[in-house]
Amino acid sequence: MDFNSLRKEIINNNASVKELVNDFFDKIKHKDPEINSYICTTKDNAIEQAENIDKLIQNKEKLPPLAGIPIAIKDNICTKGVATTCASKMLKSFVPPYESTASSKLWSSGGICLGKTNLDEFAMGSSTETSLFGVTSNPWDINRVPGGSSGGSAASVAAGFCAAAIGSDTGGSIRQPASFCGVVGLKPTYGRVSRWGLVAFASSLDQIGPITNTVSDAAEILYSISGKDPFDSTCLDKPVPNYLNDLNKSINGLKIGIIKECFEHPGLNQEVKESVLSGVDRFKALGAEIIEVECPRFNDGIATYYVIAPSEASANLARYDGVKYGYRSKEGSNLVDMTSKSRAKGFGDEVQRRILIGTYALSAGYSDAYYKKAQKVRTLIRKDFDNAFKKVDVLLTPTCPTTAFLKGDYVNDPLSMYLSDLLTVPVNLAGLPAISIPCGFDTKGLPIGLQLIGNVLEEGKILNAANIFEIDAQVIKNRPLF
């Protein structure tokens, strides 16, 4: 249910906010065991929040912009007094003493927290199969993955277990699951949204963003959570426009660049390619000018990312030693031995794999060959985007090379898993905003996503184009039945 539908229910007195929130919890209780999108729910707090909104309505007071909207939070984003586990044994018992800036802004705007959603451990993955709390299923086909690492957030929105969810995107972790689950996923410009309270994976790449049913809902969430934050030095001190204002503006004459290298990649599924190209035709019919552009180093993004991201993860995760917090092994003959055993048992296989890759890439004698070289390629990728944006307003690619794959297909094949982020990681390396919207289905009935990429701080352009496409295409007429 999108925001406007919920508001109509409330305004027309068809239901109180408390009743609507209880309906969501009933659905979660009876249906989520099949999906496993939530790690925990926060019913008592949600009911209290709902009652406060109901009082405002009864007293005919001015309502905050997200009043009564039920929202789920990815479990790598800190929530005061509510466990934030990162789906890891290492943080299974960690309860933050503070609220993240992004979630705090949501609650100040009237949003209601339903709970914390499942993810790949420490947000390292593309399938939500590495969680301590079990695998999440795709609502369109429960034998398939929802994508990752924000798979729980995307699945909860697609199944109707919340009206919106917040995720994090380091290399595609909002957009890829949004594509797999047939919902909207927005990764903002790096620094547009504060990372204060987001458990760090790769600090130069991580960004918080919304997963929603509609583009307009994503625009509302982005407006609420954006803006300067004194607790995050990388957060941009730039004006935040109301993204709703230009959502319905005509895209006649909008220059959309089709990245040649993406559509020529041998790993791109033919059905995905055809569906996205049909989307290109729709944009053309809506008045956009279609221009083919080249980004010669676009396909180098995946190799570059898997040097930089693990390197930063290696440094960030060094803090988890079982001394001050986190899992502590009861074994160990001394401090070093205890720390080693705590990390070996506290982290899962994929997290350990990435720590090892990153440590190697940063090690003496190898950092020049790997990490520093990857940073140089990152600069070249950014320059390719800069050159493309001299010719066009927005760039367009498929979100993912394939539709949702079966559980177990890639979990023991890291290379294939990493390649599922082929079309999303260059955006993070360049710090650009991008949105995934549904554009069709394959012959198995699985959703296909189309990605629009904007220049720095030009979320308004991609939201406008995505909204016009969404209204015209009406791709998602019915959600999975849950």
Curated annotation (Swiss-Prot):
GO terms for biological process: translation. One of its GO terms (molecular function) is ATP binding. InterPro entries: Amidase, Amidase_CS, Amidase_dom, AS_sf, GatA. It is an enzyme of class 6 (ligase). It holds the Pfam family Amidase. GO terms for cellular component: glutamyl-tRNA(Gln) amidotransferase complex. It catalyses: L-glutamyl-tRNA(Gln) + L-glutamine + ATP + H2O = L-glutaminyl-tRNA(Gln) + L-glutamate + ADP + phosphate + H(+). Its EC number is 6.3.5.7. It comes from the Bacteria. Keywords: ATP-binding, Ligase, Nucleotide-binding, Protein biosynthesis. The active site is at K74 (charge relay system), S149 (charge relay system), S173 (acyl-ester intermediate). Allows the formation of correctly charged Gln-tRNA(Gln) through the transamidation of misacylated Glu-tRNA(Gln) in organisms which lack glutaminyl-tRNA synthetase. The reaction takes place in the presence of glutamine and ATP through an activated gamma-phospho-Glu-tRNA(Gln). Heterotrimer of A, B and C subunits. PANTHER family: GLUTAMYL-TRNA(GLN) AMIDOTRANSFERASE SUBUNIT A, TRANSAMIDASE. HAMAP family: GatA (MF_00120). Belongs to the amidase family. GatA subfamily. This is Glutamyl-tRNA(Gln) amidotransferase subunit A. It comes from Prochlorococcus marinus (strain MIT 9215). The lineage of its organism: Bacteria, Bacillati, Cyanobacteriota, Cyanophyceae, Synechococcales.
